[in-house]
A protein has these predicted regions:
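N-terminal binding-site loop/beta-alpha segment at the start of enzyme catalytic domains
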Residues: 1-78
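Active-site beta-loop-alpha junctions enriched in small/polar residues
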Residues: 21, 54-56, 83-87, 116
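A structural motif corresponding to the C-terminal end of an alpha-helix
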Residues: 46, 106-109
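Residues at the N-termini of beta-strands
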Residues: 50, 110-113
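Generic beta-strand or strand-like secondary-structure segments
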Residues: 65-69, 83, 94-101
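Conserved small/polar residues in nucleotide/adenosyl-binding loops
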Residues: 114-123
Length: 125
């Protein structure tokens, strides 16, 4: 897998990332965990080291699933990104609470990157 080096940050990420918004699903809409785990494992085996998920993906099930699967890997072997749901935040305390929840769901501290998601107006920021 080709990597991109970010000298100032001292990191090297794969040119391809693995997005966790659309995992295979069961007929009832839940994540098909065996199939999804195989996909994530295969991406990591191929050298992908940037994993991207978000608070609302798969009705909130993506972060906990990704956190569970990634437990078997050395935390220093991948970069994990998630997104803070700005539509659910009205105060600094809300942001802190939701971010703490995300760390719990992902079973990690820290995440590598946090993006602000779905900010449609300046008021969301």
């Amino acid at each position: 897998m080709e990597k991109r080096k970010f000298e100032k940050l001292g990191i090297e990420t794969s040119l391809l990332g693995f997005g966790c918004m659309r995992f295979p699903a069961t007929p009832d809409g839940k994540i098909d965990e065996p199939r999804a785990e195989k996909l994530l494992d295969r991406a990591i085996a191929a050298g992908v080291n940037y994993i991207d998920t978000a608070y609302p993906y798969h009705n909130g099930d993506s972060e906990p699933f990704v956190g569970k699967v990634l437990q078997k890997y050395d935390r220093n072997s991948f970069y994990l990104a998630t997104k803070l749901p700005v539509w659910a935040i009205e105060s600094v305390d809300d942001a802190k609470r939701i971010f703490a929840e995300q760390l719990e769901r992902l079973r990690t501290d820290p995440v590598s990157y946090t993006h602000l998601r779905a900010h449609e107006t300046p008021e969301h920021l």
